[in-house]
């Protein structure tokens, strides 16, 4: 009977877990819808920012201004890279499947790839899970910040990028990339790697949906060409990180929703299996008791 009690306890425990995972799935689904809407609106802004870059550069080209002196811009094919900063974004919480693991694996792969080319790599981390992993494994992370990937904030992202931009402009790094797990759709995510500094001409023109941003600049901005580009570049870099944070959060909710759905289904299957085991054990116990009763009756005859 002790075995039956143990199985009953397990069934009760699994059912409680099932209720929790189902509730977490519903919460993640609700949060995902909101995050998806924010990501969609933010993407529209990012596309318009790209369109502004395109328009400014095309106007400069039409005016015969080919030599851009701004340090934010480089022809990537001619650029010699010796130092790279990798900004990675992970979640502050777990229970989201391979969301964090996949990002960390990509960071490690990129780091090894650069090191094989004798390129120095520095890491800058956003998100508790990633920062904890690298700290535990003795891998240095230059800048760490938590509670930003779970609550994207433009001012905090802007503050984080100030040091990054300062290091780039002062020559402490030649290239800055962002690695994060991005939202693809309700049931899938994808690892995204984006170079944000320097801003190469190909990066500016990489947008595959030009029809979404056909508006052009109609007024002539004041200031030199490089001042205009520097001002736009600062916004571009800051918003690139902010959009990556929003995109990552939507992907995180998507991954957690899937993970909790899988956990709920697994709990259902486990309850069925345990129930079958319980019924078998109960039947065996009843059979054993009947045999013992019959044996006792026979002994009294």
Curated annotation (Swiss-Prot):
InterPro entries associated with the record: ATP_synth_F1_ATPase_gsu (IPR035968), ATP_synth_F1_gsu (IPR000131)
Keywords annotated in UniProt: ATP synthesis, Cell inner membrane, Cell membrane, CF(1), Hydrogen ion transport, Ion transport, Membrane, Transport
Keyword Cell membrane: yes
Subcellular location, record wording: Cell inner membrane
Matches recorded under CDD domains: F1-ATPase_gamma
Domain of life: Bacteria
GO biological process: proton motive force-driven plasma membrane ATP synthesis
One GO CC annotation: plasma membrane
Pfam families: ATP-synt
Any one GO molecular-function label of the UniProt entry: proton-transporting ATP synthase activity, rotational mechanism
Membrane topology: Peripheral membrane protein
Subunit structure: F-type ATPases have 2 components, CF(1) - the catalytic core - and CF(0) - the membrane proton channel. CF(1) has five subunits: alpha(3), beta(3), gamma(1), delta(1), epsilon(1). CF(0) has three main subunits: a, b and c.
Role played: Produces ATP from ADP in the presence of a proton gradient across the membrane. The gamma chain is believed to be important in regulating ATPase activity and the flow of protons through the CF(0) complex.
Stated family: Belongs to the ATPase gamma chain family.
Protein name according to UniProt: ATP synthase gamma chain
């Amino acid at each position: 009977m002790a075995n039956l009690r143990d199985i009953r306890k397990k069934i009760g425990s699994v059912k409680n877990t099932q209720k929790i995972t189902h509730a977490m799935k519903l919460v993640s689904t609700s949060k995902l819808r909101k995050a998806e809407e924010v990501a969609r609106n933010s993407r529209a802004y990012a596309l318009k920012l790209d369109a502004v870059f395109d328009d400014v550069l095309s106007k400069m080209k039409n005016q015969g201004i080919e030599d851009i002196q701004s340090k934010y811009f480089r022809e990537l094919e001619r650029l010699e890279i010796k130092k790279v900063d990798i900004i990675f974004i992970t979640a502050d919480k777990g229970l989201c499947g391979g969301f964090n693991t996949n990002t960390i694996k990509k960071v490690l792969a990129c780091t090894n790839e650069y090191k094989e080319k004798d390129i120095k790599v520095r890491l800058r981390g956003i998100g508790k899970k990633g920062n904890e992993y690298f700290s535990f494994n003795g891998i240095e992370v230059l800048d760490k910040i938590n509670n930003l990937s779970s609550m994207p904030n433009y001012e905090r992202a802007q503050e984080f990028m100030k040091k990054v931009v300062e290091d780039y402009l002062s020559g402490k790094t030649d290239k800055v990339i962002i690695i994060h797990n991005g939202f693809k759709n309700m049931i899938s995510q994808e690892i995204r790697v984006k170079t944000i500094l320097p801003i190469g001409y190909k990066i500016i023109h990489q947008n595959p949906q030009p029809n979404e941003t056909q508006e052009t600049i109609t007024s002539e901005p004041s200031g030199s060409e490089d001042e205009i580009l520097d001002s736009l570049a600062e916004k571009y870099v800051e918003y690139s990180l902010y959009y990556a944070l929003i995109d990552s959060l939507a992907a995180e909710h998507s991954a957690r929703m899937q993970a909790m759905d899988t956990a709920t289904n697994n709990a259902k299957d486990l309850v069925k299996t345990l129930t079958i085991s319980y019924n078998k054990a109960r039947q065996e116990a009843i059979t054993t008791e009947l045999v013992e009763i019959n044996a006792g009756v026979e002994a009294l005859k």
